[in-house]
């Protein structure tokens, strides 16, 4: 599965994060890119990824147990600033 930063931006806007953060902070957050957000362990990024693999969480905070279950199925993950590619078993 390949996801782009544009997909992530749209997902965040649909949930009102652009309004909560303010446009300038929202842009700064997105400008970090996927690789930095992955390293930072961003809950929003993990919620986005889980949503895209069909595991929606009622809360934006992803429980550690759910992260662990996904991690067990993770075969490969590659992140650049503008794109993330995930391969599950």
UniProtKB/Swiss-Prot annotation:
Compartment(s) where it occurs, according to its Swiss-Prot or TrEMBL record: Membrane
GO cellular-component term (any): membrane
Main location, first listed in the record: membrane
TM spans (from-to): 28-50
Keywords: Membrane, Transmembrane, Transmembrane helix
Topology of this chain in the membrane: Single-pass membrane protein
Protein name: Uncharacterized protein AF_0752
Protein source organism: Archaeoglobus fulgidus (strain ATCC 49558 / DSM 4304 / JCM 9628 / NBRC 100126 / VC-16)
């Amino acid at each position: 599965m390949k996801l782009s930063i544009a997909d992530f931006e749209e997902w965040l806007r649909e949930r009102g994060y652009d309004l909560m953060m303010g446009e300038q902070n929202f842009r700064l957050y997105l400008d970090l890119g996927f690789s930095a957000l992955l390293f930072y362990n961003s809950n929003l990024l993990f919620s986005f990824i889980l949503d895209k693999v069909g595991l929606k969480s009622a809360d934006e905070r992803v429980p550690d147990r759910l992260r662990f279950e996904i991690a067990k199925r993770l075969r490969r993950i590659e992140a650049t600033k503008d794109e993330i590619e995930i391969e599950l078993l």
